[in-house]
Amino acid sequence: MSAAMMLASCGGTKEAGQNGALIERSDIKIEGQRMTPEALWAMGRIGGLAVSPDGKKIAYTVAYYSVPENKSNREVFVMNADGSDNRQITRTPYQENEVTWIKGGSKLAFLSNDNGSSQLYEMNPDGSGRKQLTNYDGDIEGYSISPDGKKLLFISQVKTKESTADKYPDLPKATGIIVTDLMYKHWDEWVTTAQHPFVA
């Protein structure tokens, strides 16, 4: 039984994510040979890459940003190892990331949030045959598939402390935070979850 089939039963059906505007590459304008903040924001940010098992192809991601919308969009590209035949194989308003080659290089696995939460998908190296593999009740933040394709290690957030609503079920809309000890970090947010590995 594949890891995808095992995880399919981990959660219920997700609500479809809202379609946002597609954020694509912007024209970079350099005036007077000076790099400006606008030019920097127009550049795509290259993400993680994966080399195919035969060493002939490279899959990688690029994020494009929209300053007015204050958000980004990440897409998957595939090219030959020598840099030729560079092609964008996804074009969606969602986030595609953590791309890797599976099934001997015949498929690409990746994470996407197009159904409202980050789940594992697969597709052909040309972008066709997109298929959701997991239906985990939460966001998958990272993963690794065993060489035989039968086991999946994935990372997801788990609660580290009870929330106010957990402690007081009769106050489900309460948003206050009860502090009984000193903070142990200087960051500007309350840490209520932590990354945890799971195996399926």
Task: Say what each PLM segment does.
Residues 55-59, 89, 105-109, 133, ...:
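Hydrophobic beta-strand positions that form the internal "hydrophobic ladder"
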